[in-house]
Amino acid sequence: MKQIMIFLTSFMLLAMTGQTALAKDVQVSGSLLGKSSQEQAKQQVLTSELITLYGSKDSAELTYQIPAGASSGNQQLVIEYEASNLLISPSSLTVVIDDEPVKTLKLDGDSKRKTVKLNLNKSQSAQGYHNVSLKFYGVMKEGVCVRQDTSGNWIKIYPDSRLTLADSSEAKGTSLDHYPYPFAQSGNTAEETAIVIPDNPSSAEIEAAVKTEGYLKTVDSSVSIAYVTESELKKIDKPTIVIGVDKHWNGKVKKLLKQAGLQAKGENLLLAERVLKAEGKQQPVLFAQAASEDALTKKISVMTDQTYTGQLSGDTLSISKLQQTEKKESDKLTLENFGAGDITIGADKTSSAHYFYPASAVLDENQSAKLSLKLKKSETIQASTAENESASQAAELKVMINGQPHSVRLDELGKEDKNGFYHVTVKVDPKLLQKNRYIDIQFVTTGLKENNPCNTTDEEKWVFIDKNSTLSYAIKGMSPSADFQEWPLPYAGNQDQTTLIVLPDTVSQSKLEELSLVTESFGNEAQHSYTVKKSSDVTANDAKGRNLIFIGGINQFSLLKEKSSDLLVPQEKNGSFDVSSFEMLNETTKQVVFTQASVWDSRYTMAVFAPSKGDGTAVTKEIISYLNSNDESATVLNETNSQQVFTNHQQLKSETNSSDAEQPTQDHSQKWMYIGVLALIMVVAAVFIWIAVRRKKRKTDTE
């Protein structure tokens, strides 16, 4: 039934627009626009790390993406390289774009770092992804049967290599087909986007804005998001998303909506992408508007859930029905999830590109993880195994996971299945998967090149890796215990009721940034795991049956203030927290964070992020960084004036040790108590027996 609903929703999304169209232009006052999107030259890195190719033949595969709406001219590919000074003619580097040779560079032993700039033609500038192959052929010595595969036969490709969209590129307009471009785009550097919300945003508007930011960052982790309220909006000088309920706009945004003729109706969510133009300047703006907060809350997932974002099209959509998909934290990733297709590497192309996927925040480091590979290999590898044992030992596939190699012997793959695939399982350290924010996978082959210069054939040794190969790991259970050692559990991950994050009624830009820090630490797939509400929108009944997070000063939450005497960290008369009982200094404490059983429902937990006093900053990057990396038990932590973070871990450890030490003493005391009682019973019994015997004897003597 759920699949049918999603299909119907997909059909409705497509039916709500006629044909694909570019965003409509809206003429505005010149004072509203800052610098134009045309002035913002964009660069796209081709590789994030140094690439080294070794002769005599080697190659590397790179990709670039032409954004939607970019000009088909004035685009340039820049390759920064340096080659060994031992190379002689006919050494070369050939650049191939989309299987078409573009340029061959002569390498003649000049070891200086060089730059080659390639102007892209119309087909190479077409919107979408394009492949770049860098093919290296290195010769170090003339002659017949001369080995060229030495350590001095190399060329380096620098991370400065890039795609440049020149300043004069004329945007053709954008549409919802390309969302989230131009607000975020994988591969771009220094992307900037603004999210505009009403001056006094409601709970629904805050949640929609933060979840939209979270989605944009899954597409481009380097994108910089700035929150702007309507009254703070002086100029639109970057791609902008406007999120809100119609009746909450009173200034520039209200005027813009009227100029563009946009108004949400009923319970629909209106999505409209427009290009604002004035005096030769232009900027793209996406309006996400609803007539009610309920409509915004229920339908914002069309912008934040990949199930729906790929179905958007046209310049205007009015979303009427949306099936809420039940998201579960995934414990299995295919190479396709990493953005890879089927991969073929071998003698002429020894390494694949790097593929990335956000690391799960709720991955269980105490349980096993594995990479299940589905492979094919060339018959020539098998032939070399039979003929040359040393060659077979060198034939190897290395899987690089976050820089750590994992070896697969290509002569020990076992038997093929009926479809000709080999199935290999590689054990992976689960801690390695959380080493960085993103999991980085690359495949490299060794031992497949022909080492005998007199034995040259056209046989190419290769390994094929199916895109359905999977990386599997365990997800942490939803432990109800209050302990920061398990952060972000139990607040993120799979749960029956979403975590309720409570903010003060007055929400500033800085408070939104604090909220963003907390939700980002939940991980990539956490959009479904939390709900945001302002303090006045939360009742005691809302707080039951779920986990809670409060961000702000205690006095900003009437619900929390009523329970101040039940909080783990006590407060002084002036309202400031007293952390002295946790071996911390009140005088140097700026922020306090603690977790405990919920004071409204002890089956669940709550966490409080607060300034030590007043209504200042409650969440910092230092606190979140500590929580993300912490593996020690702690229920209270503080950040000092010097940005150092301390916890009550040692105190908890001492209490646990004391409890363990007291237990044998108590057991010993109880043992002697039982012995004493037993001895007393025996004495009493003996006395009764003695008295009974005496009475019986007297009675006998009397007779």
UniProtKB/Swiss-Prot annotation:
InterPro entries: Cell_synthase_bac. It is a single-pass membrane protein. Keywords: Cell membrane, Membrane, Signal, Transmembrane, Transmembrane helix. GO terms for cellular component: plasma membrane. Pfam families: BcsB. GO terms for biological process: UDP-alpha-D-glucose metabolic process. The chain crosses the membrane at residues 673-693. It comes from the Bacteria. It is found in: Cell membrane. Residues 1-23 form the signal peptide. Disulfide bonds: none annotated. PANTHER family: CYCLIC DI-GMP-BINDING PROTEIN. This is Uncharacterized protein YdaN. It comes from Bacillus subtilis (strain 168). The gene is ydaN.
